[in-house]
Amino acid sequence: MDLRVIEKDDAELTIEVAGENHTFMNVLKGTLLETDGVTAASYDMNPEQSGGQTEPLLTIKTDGDVDPVDALQAAAGHTSQKLQSFADTFEAAV
């Protein structure tokens, strides 16, 4: 996975998330939407709609009180916790 900041200001961040697919992007987007201060989260990886873009572009918008980079860090941490919880539960079940 490679990340490249496309655009950033106090309340919005757009980054390219190279090497990822819909599965990962949907999980990350869903967790971002549950994150305090995030007002919108979306991604685009459709070349026809994004001028030939083939890698996912993630856009995060916040209420302005939360830095979008901080929101992304929080969402990444929460996603990691969810995956660890699933792994622990699965391990106990089998």
Swiss-Prot record:
Enzymatic class: transferase
Source organism phylogeny: Archaea, Methanobacteriati, Methanobacteriota, Stenosarchaea group, Halobacteria
UniProt subcellular location: Cytoplasm
GO cellular component entries: cytoplasm; DNA-directed RNA polymerase complex
Task of the protein: DNA-dependent RNA polymerase (RNAP) catalyzes the transcription of DNA into RNA using the four ribonucleoside triphosphates as substrates.
Keywords noted in UniProt: Cytoplasm, DNA-directed RNA polymerase, Nucleotidyltransferase, Transcription, Transferase
Alphabetized SUPFAM superfamilies for the sequence: RBP11-like subunits of RNA polymerase
HAMAP family: RNApol_arch_Rpo11
Assembly and interaction partners: Part of the RNA polymerase complex.
GO molecular function per UniProt: DNA binding; DNA-directed RNA polymerase activity; protein dimerization activity
Organism: Halobacterium salinarum (strain ATCC 700922 / JCM 11081 / NRC-1)
Protein name, as recorded: DNA-directed RNA polymerase subunit Rpo11
InterPro entries found in the cross-reference section: RBP11-like, RBP11-like_dimer, RNA_pol_Rpb11_13-16kDa_CS, Rpo11-like
